[in-house]
Swiss-Prot record:
3-amino-2-oxopropyl phosphate binds at N7, R18, G198, G219, H220. One of its GO terms (biological process) is pyridoxine biosynthetic process. 1-deoxy-D-xylulose 5-phosphate binds at D9, H10, R45, H50, T103. Homooctamer; tetramer of dimers. The record marks E154 as: Transition state stabilizer. It holds the Pfam family PdxJ. GO terms for cellular component: cytosol. Belongs to the PNP synthase family. Keywords: Cytoplasm, Pyridoxine biosynthesis, Transferase. This is Pyridoxine 5'-phosphate synthase. It comes from Caulobacter sp. (strain K31). Catalyzes the complicated ring closure reaction between the two acyclic compounds 1-deoxy-D-xylulose-5-phosphate (DXP) and 3-amino-2-oxopropyl phosphate (1-amino-acetone-3-phosphate or AAP) to form pyridoxine 5'-phosphate (PNP) and inorganic phosphate. The lineage of its organism: Bacteria, Pseudomonadati, Pseudomonadota, Alphaproteobacteria, Caulobacterales.
């Protein structure tokens, strides 16, 4: 079954907007797991704009108690590798990070940063973390990810979702085809394939229909929708669409 990882970063965004102690990301994570999330994703950014070090400690403890994986998103820096080695999350997803960006704007350039990424990957794997690289569906990046020692690639779906939402059908179709080809290549290299960024109800099914994808990581949309309908209900509808896409492919 296609897995759903729930990113709870933007619960922390709401909390930090008032400099308060609530809403608590760990409470959102607990609700998500109770509602059937297959794992929790959290991004500890260098500027700590949403998730904090304390959140990571609480989320690590929660996921261990619930027997579910924590996917720790992190920049490729010595500081973040050190934090990950101490927290020992189930998975570490290396992502690009620029302080001036509002959200992650694209995939990690594994080709350009190969030596640094390979070294971080080796350190994390030695500590028992399952290492994922967040990349574009580009053949060179996928091959470099395998060469760097990653076990997983997470394909960046943001460009597809933006094109589809904006009504650029031809562009969306071309990007979707690249995602399909990239997923096939990654799987052929022995990499587990995940996907994420920008996914909502309108865009999830074409992505979920790609058979090589094992997991979708969705956050901003689910947290936004939860304001209106509640997190379990938002997740349930997403899960229905994901499962329907897989059933349609099987049929």
């Amino acid at each position: 079954m296609l897995r759903l990882g729930v990113n709870i970063d933007h619960v922390a965004t709401i909390r930090n907007a008032r400099g308060s102690s609530y809403p608590e990301p760990v409470r959102a994570a607990e609700l998500a797991l109770a509602a059937g999330a297959d794992g929790i994703t959290a991004h500890l950014r260098e500027d700590r704009r949403h998730i904090s070090d304390a959140d990571i400690a609480l989320l690590t403890d929660l996921c261990l108690k619930r027997g579910k994986p924590l996917n720790f998103e992190m920049a490729v820096t010595d500081e973040m590798v050190g934090i990950a080695l101490q927290a020992r999350p189930h998975a570490a997803c290396l992502v690009p990070e620029r302080r001036e960006e509002v959200t992650t704007e694209g995939g990690l350039d594994v080709v350009k940063g190969f030596d640094k990424i390979a070294a971080a990957t080796a350190r994390l794997r030695t500590a028992g973390a399952r290492v994922s690289l967040f990349i574009e569906a580009d053949p060179a990046q996928i091959q470099a990810s395998a060469d760097a020692g990653a076990q997983v690639v997470e394909l960046h779906t943001g460009a597809y979702c933006d094109a589809a939402r904006e009504g650029h059908a031809d562009r969306a179709a071309a990007i979707l085809e690249r995602l399909k080809t990239g997923a096939e290549l990654a799987a052929s290299l022995g990499l587990e394939v995940h996907a994420g960024h920008g996914i909502d109800y309108a865009t999830v099914k074409p992505i979920a229909a790609i058979p090589q994808i094992a997991e979708l990581n969705i956050g901003h949309f689910l947290i936004g929708e939860a304001i209106f309908v509640g997190l379990p209900q938002a997740m349930q509808r997403m899960r229905v669409l994901m499962d329907a896409a897989r059933l349609e492919v099987a049929a």
